[in-house]
Design a protein with these regions (language model features):
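Short, recurring structural edge motifs at helix starts
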Residues: 422-424, 551-558, 587-592
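Beta-lactam-recognizing serine transpeptidase/beta-lactamase-like catalytic domain environment
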Residues: 57, 180-191, 232, 237-281, ...
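Periplasmic/cell-envelope proteins involved in peptidoglycan metabolism and beta-lactam response
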Residues: 1-256, 276, 351-361, 462, ...
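Short amphipathic alpha-helical signal-transduction/dimerization elements
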Residues: 413, 453, 528-535, 539
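Conserved "repeat-terminator" motif of extracellular CCP/Sushi domains
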Residues: 596-606
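Glycine-rich loop/hinge motif
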Residues: 540-582
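Short, well-ordered beta-strand elements
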Residues: 65-67, 492-493, 501-517, 604
Length: 606
């Protein structure tokens, strides 16, 4: 019997040792959890500014509404009040108010202070408010894709908000408090407090005024050209700063279309970075730069355009099917002659052409600090046939993002590689001091761009300022392959000042449907709008040596044969783009009687 009693006491001693010594810490923590509550203190996200210090995104205090069902005296009263004040479904609230098997349940996040105050004043049993942090965008939809937005729990979802989320979000804090068995806080019992650390502030490279100038032009495109999308950007050629960047349509960052995820996703994308397209004639800037650098051509070099070239037995047409005739390289660039650029690409050959594509960054991501960048689509060099190379010369059979194209163009017209960036550095060094072409080639390309811009006349000419430019028109392709008939992307690249560019812009019009689609008529006029307003904002003085253009009156050519119309245009110094089979003129743009600059390229439809 004594042995049995001794064994029992021994077992109890071992059990007591296990409880007190081995499991003591664990049990202490469990007990502590039962009578303490940890309250998260949400860290304010850092503020986002533009390069001038204008606020683009800022955090402010809102409130989260919770209910502790065990403390609710009248579920109907509480559910009625909250559903009315918060504009949410009564049944949903009532169901949550009845959940007595949990300590508390969330009713709504991010309630504005005014509404939270009304809830507080009603002294509803079991209803509690906790401070939260929400995001506010003072400019609504300005730079919406670039800035991006956060989720309801303050996590960056798109744009800068997502890309730099780790910097912006800060570190949440916590307060640990005593509570009773129902989870109710015991007043004055704060155990300890960890302060929230605010996120870092960011300064973006964009200038809000330039951004507004760009977006105004894009909005005009959407309205006047009835386009599917309109995109554009302004870049500092000297250092790669993105001064403005946008795609329309867009949405107000304070009123997200969360109920339509397709719209939310599509309009959140920075298409200039994510979407590839066939650039068309704007790509000719790269082809001519490579050919000039290799000494394969000169501004006085002669080319003949019959309206087509036959390559590998395949007929490839120039956009001007009746041909441009004999022309110098300077004239061919101004005419945007496809035949000339087929010749230049073939002179380069596949090996050299691809060497320059690599130098210009084609087929590679630029590394810009925006999520979702595409690398473009460059045919494997080993697969390129002669006919493919000919088409590449004028911007077909190759796909890239607009940011890739502008990265390449800026490295050519500025003479050095640039670091594209969305973040602003006050003392950022100009470019990388890494040349991709010689200074002489840069000079010649800028001359070509100034000449081409002058040829578009009325549509891009800004009196008193030397602007360079190149237009482009490219057909779109179906996802399944093959040309998507009647669908085009019209574009314009502009530079200023033409001889030594500081600024470069691009305007893209996706699927214009107002009756015309040529880049010179659809995209270039909005490039002019951007430059005009940019010069006013920058207080840019007019240049004494800028080109002064003579005015002429547009004649009535409707009903004439194409041949007679061309004779009339030649008499007064106008050029034309021709749409149709070359018969009788049925439509002209601009209409008869319009005062336009001599040298303007007009549209004739036959």
């Amino acid at each position: 019997m004594l042995l049995v009693i001794s064994f029992i006491f021994c077992a109890l001693g071992v059990r007591l040792f296990v409880i007190q010594i081995i499991n003591g810490k664990s049990l202490q923590l469990k007990a502590t959890d039962q009578w303490t509550r940890d309250l998260k203190i949400v860290a304010p996200r850092g503020t986002i500014y533009d390069r001038t210090g204008a606020t683009l995104a800022v955090s402010y205090t809102t409130y989260n509404v919770f209910v502790r069902a065990r403390e609710v005296k009248s579920p109907t009263t509480v559910a009625t009040a909250l559903s009315t004040l918060l504009n949410i479904d009564f049944d949903n609230v009532y169901q949550k108010v009845q959940k007595k098997n949990v300590s508390e349940v969330l009713i709504k996040l991010g309630v504005e202070s005014e509404i939270a105050e009304k809830i507080y004043q009603q002294k509803l049993s079991g209803v509690y408010l906790a401070e939260n942090v929400s995001r506010y965008y003072p400019n609504g939809n300005l730079a919406s894709q670039l800035i991006g937005f956060t989720s309801v729990d303050n996590v960056g979802q798109t744009g800068v908000e997502a890309y730099y989320d780790e910097l912006l979000k800060g570190q949440d804090g916590y307060s640990y408090v005593q509570s009773d068995l129902q989870g109710k806080e015991i007043g004055g019992s704060l155990r300890y407090y960890i302060q929230a650390q605010e996120g870092e502030n960011l300064y973006l490279s964009i200038d809000s005024k330039m951004q507004q100038i760009l977006e105004n032009a894009l909005n005009n495109i959407m309205q006047e050209q009835k386009a599917k999308n309109a995109s554009g950007m302004i870049i500092d050629v000297t250092n790669g700063d993105i001064l403005a960047m946008s795609t329309k349509p867009s949405f107000d960052l304070n009123e997200l279309p969360r109920d339509d995820l397709d719209i939310l996703f599509d309009q959140s994308k920075m298409k200039l970075v994510t979407d590839m397209y066939e650039p068309g004639s704007t790509f000719k800037i790269l082809t001519v730069a490579a050919a000039l650098e290799e000494g394969l051509t000169s501004l006085e070099d002669k080319f003949y355009c019959s309206g087509y070239r036959i390559v590998d037995g395949i007929k490839i047409k120039c956009w001007k099917t009746i041909g441009h005739g004999s022309q110098t390289l300077l004239e061919a660039f101004g005419n945007s002659c496809n035949c000339c650029f087929m010749d230049l690409a073939l002179r380069l050959g596949v090996e050299k052409f691809y060497q320059y594509m690599e130098k210009f960054g084609i087929g590679q991501k630029t590394g810009i600090d925006i999520s979702g960048e595409s690398s473009g689509m460059l045919m494997p060099k080993s697969s390129v046939k002669t006919v493919d190379l000919a088409r590449m010369g004028f911007g077909h059979a190759i796909a890239m993002t607009p940011i890739q194209l502008m990265n390449a163009v800026c490295s050519i017209i500025g003479g050095q590689k640039i670091d594209l960036s969305i973040l602003y550095e006050e003392n950022k060094q100009d470019s990388q001091n890494v040349s991709v072409i010689s200074s002489n080639t840069t000079k010649l390309v800028n001359q070509l761009l100034e000449y081409a811009e002058n040829k578009t006349g009325k549509y891009t000419f800004v009196e008193g300022y030397n602007v360079g430019g190149k237009t482009g028109t490219a057909q779109k392709y179906k996802e399944t392959g093959g040309i998507d008939q009647g669908k085009y992307i019209s574009s314009f690249i502009g530079t200023y000042p033409a001889d030594a560019p500081k600024y470069a812009i691009i305007v893209l019009v996706d699927e214009p449907s107002a009756g015309i689609y040529y880049g010179s008529l659809v995209a270039a006029p909005y490039g002019k709008q951007i430059f005009e307003n940019l010069f006013i904002y920058l207080n840019e003085e007019k240049q004494d040596d800028s080109v002064v253009v003579e005015k002429v009156t547009m004649p009535n050519l409707i009903g004439m044969s194409l041949g007679d119309a061309l004779i009339e245009l030649k008499k007064i110094g106008l050029y034309c783009e021709i749409e149709g089979d070359g018969g009788v003129i049925t439509k002209q743009l601009p209409p008869a009687g319009t005062s336009i600059n001599k040298g303007t390229t007009i549209l004739l439809v036959t």
